[in-house]
Amino acid sequence: MKEMRPKPEDTAPEISRRQFLRTSALAAGGAVMGACGESPTGPSDPTARVSAVTGTDLHVMVGEVLAQLGGIQSVVNQGETVFIKPNMVSLPWAEHGNSFTGGECTKPEIVAAVAEECLRAGAAEVTVGDGSHALELPWEHATTLDGSTNLLAEMARLSQEYGRPARVASLEVDSPEWVEVPTGTSLGTILVSSLLTTADRVISIPVAKTHSWAQLTLSLKNFIGVAPLWRYGDLPNGIPDRGVVFDHSSPRAIAAIYLDMVRGIQPDLAIVDFSIGIEGNGPNLSHGGRTVDMRDRLGSYLLLASTDLVAADTTAARIMSHDPGKVVQLQMGYEMGLGEMRKDHIELIGPRLSDLRVPWASAHIGGQALMAQVVCPRQAGRGHPLHG
């Protein structure tokens, strides 16, 4: 077992040109998450585009949802390196549980399909990575829903087929170094893996879940897992947990951290996995969350994609029957200029929002539901599944 401690070079102040440009822009803009009382600056692009696709074949759906945005080639150029960040929060225990069929983790078939799209577009290298709650992740247990293969095997296949590196990375042990990103919180800076800061393109692929500390965990919150456990974690009950240093006292407090990370990293694309997710007191079943299979509520799986992460997450919130105006991270992200949340400024490509919205139980924080549920037309004529 490798020790959870930094090597001397892990905290080296050197940063890539890409990260320098990004953090310089952050500093120049006076990026301070805590200053949420400021007037909203709004996004630079007045209209965001969110692609939505329904179906039952996740591999096929990936191509379709990207095609509606102009294809992956509109994001990834030939010769560029790509980092893909799925949500693999319970992968360390996937061998003994239902991390994927239970809705806790991003589905491996989606991740592999996105990686292949990038390679097909000419990407020089694709890395899939996460930190989760372990030093080394058992990627061989990231099994597809049909059980036919796993993410480790699929990345090896893609590497051989395209003749370019396609790999998985456990950030705690595979990060060459850790790069400081400015934050307006008391931390001053936040370390993130250099695998993201040196990549030409960064793609967030979360699974749709409610969260007992963050309200929702989608493409923005997904980046909490790229910070090192050795700096921000501890071992309560033997499980590394970033909540030891990162302030989880309220949705606003934790959002102040991961939104500054997003602003420093500047992701290029979000793809939201709406196949099987979590409602109620997520992000895990062990916390009191409940599995949501979209085939039961929508009649099919659903994928969202957008180059605007705030717009993607805002649309996801609406589909989950949550009021985006009461989801703290979305309001904060909009005020920071990270993206669009105004409904009339988001173009939904594909099915109508009213045809996608499903009942989805909110998380409870301190015994109170923080998000007002909107009326969902799918509740008419049947028992309310939010309480079933």
What label would you give each PLM region?
Residues M1-I15:
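N-terminal secretory signal peptides
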Residues A12-Q19, G30-S44:
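N-terminal twin-arginine translocation
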Residues F20-R22, L338:
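Extended, hydrophobic interaction surfaces within ordered domains
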Residues T23, G34-A35, V181, V226:
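Generic signature of intrinsically disordered, low-complexity segments enriched in small/polar residues
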Residues S24-A28:
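Sec-dependent signal peptide hydrophobic core
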Residues D45-A112, E116-G388:
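Extended, low-polarity segments enriched in aliphatic/aromatic residues
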